[in-house]
Amino acid sequence: MHDPGRAAYTGPMTRNTRTIPANVSPEAAALLERAYAIDSDATSRALYRDWAETYDATMLDGLRYRSPALVAALLGEHLPDRTAQVLDVGCGTGLAGQSLAELGFELIDGMDISPEMMQVAARRGVYRHFIAADLNQPLDMPDAHYDGAACSGTFTHGHVDARCLDELFRILRPGAPFAFTVKREVWEPLGFKDALQRLMAEGRITESAFRLDRHYDSSEQPDGVFCVYRRT
């Protein structure tokens, strides 16, 4: 069995290791630090309530954020049917959904904890439905509901740990790919390596793609794990 942690993890990392890309504005760095410091659902909701209207400018202009487009492209490579029902997990303001729509996907649902972020995402006109959900809790959704899923910017410091993976794969149909990225610094500390290995050992998922890449153009080295796993 392939060990995803072998390529991704090269030395000791802790929950307190938080890398801010170089050469970004002080405003962008401050917001990213605030995001990394989230310690509860309440602080998460408060941050994204305050950040919703300026998030895109901060991430695209201030940080030169590339993860949403990369994750969308990964899903597009592994899900050729553009009429498939796709879930954008932690959709935020819809950056990944916009990229999915540009690739031709027609049936995209967005899921997020922040109503303010989803209100911004709705303006893009690319989503079919929105689902308010806390990924740290069981999802009120039927089994085998989606043909594929994408997730960018959610599996990072202070947001959601690997316990959500069981639920996310549960709502995917057999054979459905899930393309996502995990902040490299939390790959092991927040349990993603172990959870994925367990799910593979149980025969519930298979690995389709795995690589290291940069979340931001301003990053000096790969700071994210980008991968695709399929529900069996």
Please tell me what each predicted stretch does.
Residues L87-P138:
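Class I SAM-dependent methyltransferase SAM/SAH-binding core
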Residues H2, R6, T10-D41:
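N-terminal auxiliary segments of SAM/dcSAM-dependent transferases
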Residues R163-P174:
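A short glycine-rich, Lys/Arg-flanked "PGG" loop and its adjoining helix->strand segment in the class I
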Residues G175-K183:
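Conserved beta-strand signature within the Rossmann-like core of class I S-adenosyl-L-methionine
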Residues Y216-T232:
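Core SAM-dependent methyltransferase catalytic element
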Residues Y65-R82:
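Conserved alpha-helix/loop element of class I SAM-dependent methyltransferases that forms part
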Residues L139-A149:
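A short acidic, Gly/Pro-enriched loop at the edge of an enzyme's catalytic core
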Residues L190-R211:
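Conserved Class I S-adenosyl-L-methionine
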